Amino acid sequence: MSMAEMRCPFSGHGAATTPASATTNQHWWPEQINLGLLHQHNPAANPLGSNFDYRQAFNSLDLNAVKADLMALMTDSQSWWPADWGHYGGLFIRMAWHSAGTYRLADGRGGAGHGNQRFAPLNSWPDNTNLDKARRLLWPIKAKYGSNLSWADLIILAGNCALESMGLPTAGFAGGREDIWEPEDDIYWGSETSWLSDERHDNDGAIESPLAATEMGLIYVNPEGPHGEPDPVASGREVRDTFARMGMNNEETVALVAGGHTFGKAHGAAPSAHLGADPEGAALEQLGLGWQNTYASGCGADTITSGIEGAWKPNPTRWDQGYFEMLFGYEWELHQSPAGAWQWHPKDVKAEHMIPDAHVPGRSAPPMMTTADLSLRFDPVYEPIARRFLGDPQAFGNAFAQAWFKLTHRDLGPRSCYLGADVPEAVMSWQDPLPTTSHPTIDAPAVDALKQELLNTGLSHGELISTAWASAASFRQSDRRGGANGARLRLQPQCNWELNNPEQLKRVLSVLEAVQMRFNQQHQGGMQVSLADLIVLSGSAAVEQAMAATGQRCRVRFTPGRVDASAEQTDNASFNALKPIADGFRNYLRSDLPLKAEQLLVDRAQQLHLSAPEMTALIGGFRVLGLNWDGSDIGVFTSRPGQFSNDFFVNLLDMSTQWSPVEGHSNLYQGIDTETKQPRWRASRVDLVFGSHAQLRAIAEVYGQAGGSARLAADFSAAWSKVMELDRFDLL
């Protein structure tokens, strides 16, 4: 055997057929949907095992001991990465901020909830330069507490401790963030193919949804100004848009920018040409550390990060009003840093405002501001807020503490997901709060009695099932928002979403509310039923009866205990971000979307934590039950709509039907009988993808073959119950 034949097949060298160098299917067929998005984070990839309970592990921690270790680390400067002014606080605040700051409101993705800063692409984003060192500084603490403390929680807790160590009382801390063990492939970070490039703005300057940052590889905006142009007013417009896309209002934005820049410094000792590859591209022997710096010592006073150089205020390791005092106390002139980045220096700086160098005794420098910082002074909306904070230190401190808590906890989910002794008692509207109840929930006999009453209301199976789905399927796993608990389907804005068929919804809910009122009046002082439970129970009962009509006997799991939220507990603007632009399960698609319907179906299924078989089973069941949002016959491949069967798959796979697109409709197809040439069915792209896509067709064949009907009923029932309980964090 030759040496070439003996080469390792995973090395990327040698034969053209080695796996590491092979051209992928996605290269050949880039338009094909990626079902891998539905099967991320396989339990087999988790070294802790499927039985590991992080909630239990975290609750066993001595949280005060962890915080004491973090406090000690703040001033334990290491020679391999020395702390600025002997304090790592600024570095850890940036690390925590950049972990949480990837969150965007539009789809709930990003954020601090999974420790994804450890993996590509975030670990190698230009805006995260040198945060690999921050995580390595934390490693001894992570190693000490092991699996009882996730990286995701440790990163945020380190930021909290950094703030407290420098004099800011925080609003609290909640644990509960479970680590992932591989990159998240479902997050769309943009279409750009080079760092710090911008192809996400349209001709009117709007950022492509769901993105929030202005350039590829940035957390927020370019600190030098839009596209590197040092224009504070234009920067203010970008800052406002970006922070709003991350769920922050104007006051929260000013507080966060000013509060974050109260500490630490920016680093731009020399041009970025001195930096080596990022962590993902670094040499093997660097063990995951990137941005090796060839300038002078490569660290300390010679550090290169953003290219901007300097601190914002005197005393960069203490919480005070210095940021605003500098911002409004001077006129500012444009300069370039040693790295060539645009930044601003004060005119005629006073001697007492010169800032001692972070590492070199006897050397000092004036304060600096970025273009984005100056937007707080020159933007007409931000300026009065900033001046108010300048004159009211307590208001500034409180606003920053609350905004920081929101920033770092936004994607953790409802308060029932919060762990630890430092969880604040205060309830915030952005947490989508739910009321507490003291009455007992309905028991099994009551459930059975209510089922019969609900089925006898005169409402159709389709009306009951579609209402339950509309309630539960608002859930998104990205930030654990939405879902059936709270019955917010009856409140603004959800009750008026086009997808939810408002007129039908109003009629169905009025009937269910009457059932609820009768039951609760009959059981005063005892068990009570919430509308949230009734919505789910009615849909589940209708599913069971539709299955029974075709001989399928399935018991749909139902667990009571949901509560009803009030309008006062519901932030309309925030909840409107959950409004679906497409729902393939109900054959709903807005006409102005650039993505194909089948791509949006996979995205929706991923947010509902569904596998490809679960998604397939639900689609097949929904079609024969006639659950299209508008009542159309599109995809209803059955002669007995409303009865549960595997007809959708049987007829989809029938070779005697020939399909062709309907002229003038991008999402509509006509199926004709190949013999008679008569129309048979109409279908959407979502319907036909289950016969077109090889993997989905393979699953569809299982449901369309002999024995498929019983399997479909069981799988549909399980998937339905799963979706109905996605937001039941109280059951954890």
From Swiss-Prot:
The active site is at 98 (proton acceptor). InterPro entries: Catalase_peroxidase, Haem_peroxidase, Haem_peroxidase_sf, Peroxidases_AS, Peroxidases_heam-ligand_BS. The record marks 94 as: Transition state stabilizer. Residues 1-21 are annotated as: Disordered. Formation of the three residue Trp-Tyr-Met cross-link is important for the catalase, but not the peroxidase activity of the enzyme. It is an enzyme of class 1 (oxidoreductase). One of its GO terms (cellular component) is cytosol. Heme b binds at residue 261. Its cofactor is heme b. Residues 1-22 form the signal peptide. Bifunctional enzyme with both catalase and broad-spectrum peroxidase activity. NCBIfam families: cat_per_HPI, PRK15061.1. Homodimer or homotetramer. This is Catalase-peroxidase. It comes from Synechococcus sp. (strain RCC307). The gene is katG.
